[in-house]
Amino acid sequence: MQLNVNDAQAIEVSELTFGGEFNETLVHQAVVAYMAGGRQGSKQQKTRSDVRGGGKRPWRQKGTGRARAGTIRSPIWRGGGTTFAARPQDHSQKLNKKMYRAALRSILAELVRTDRLVVVQDFAVESPKTKDLLGKLNNMSLTDVLIVSEAVDQNLYLAARNLPHVDVRDVQGSDPVSLIAYDKVLITVSAVKKFEELLG
């Protein structure tokens, strides 16, 4: 299949990588797994056994007329432990490499199908100035965009750093969440070839 390139001839690309069907279930699974892997999972609360004190019972079992109490750190009491206390846990989900690659192929194919993939021969800025990058993007009518190149250009990265709706990634650093989070994905021809090499 062919991909149109801005201000250049169309390029021939793999049907497998850029022309497959959209597998929504698989993409959802990949996105959930990716986001779950980013969770810190370090929250911790104290149960009645973790809270300091509460070893001696506050009053005797019988004869006071009050309700029975065995510890001042009971979850019912103020200053007591938490009933179902949170514990540190690993939230990461297993996703096979084969499934992950298939999800990326599915996302790329959907980007092509919905005209959200903008292919350019090359994309760079001469100096690390946000104003210069913004001018280039405005000329292409791009406001909410992910820029993907084979390797991240330092000037481009610095110029985009202060723009809330622009992100710069290399092919290796592209993930399912970033690829679907933006209105458009601006990608260089060399990055397209790299994707074919990795996902083909």
Curated annotation (Swiss-Prot):
Keywords noted in UniProt: Ribonucleoprotein, Ribosomal protein, RNA-binding, rRNA-binding
One GO term of the biological process aspect: translation
Coiled-coil positions: none
Biased composition (Basic residues): 54-65
InterPro entries per UniProt: Ribosomal_uL4, Ribosomal_uL4-like, Ribosomal_uL4_dom_sf
Keyword rRNA-binding found: yes
Known function: One of the primary rRNA binding proteins, this protein initially binds near the 5'-end of the 23S rRNA. It is important during the early stages of 50S assembly. It makes multiple contacts with different domains of the 23S rRNA in the assembled 50S subunit and ribosome. Forms part of the polypeptide exit tunnel.
The protein's name in its UniProt record: Large ribosomal subunit protein uL4
Protein source organism: Pseudomonas fluorescens (strain SBW25)
Gene that encodes the chain: rplD
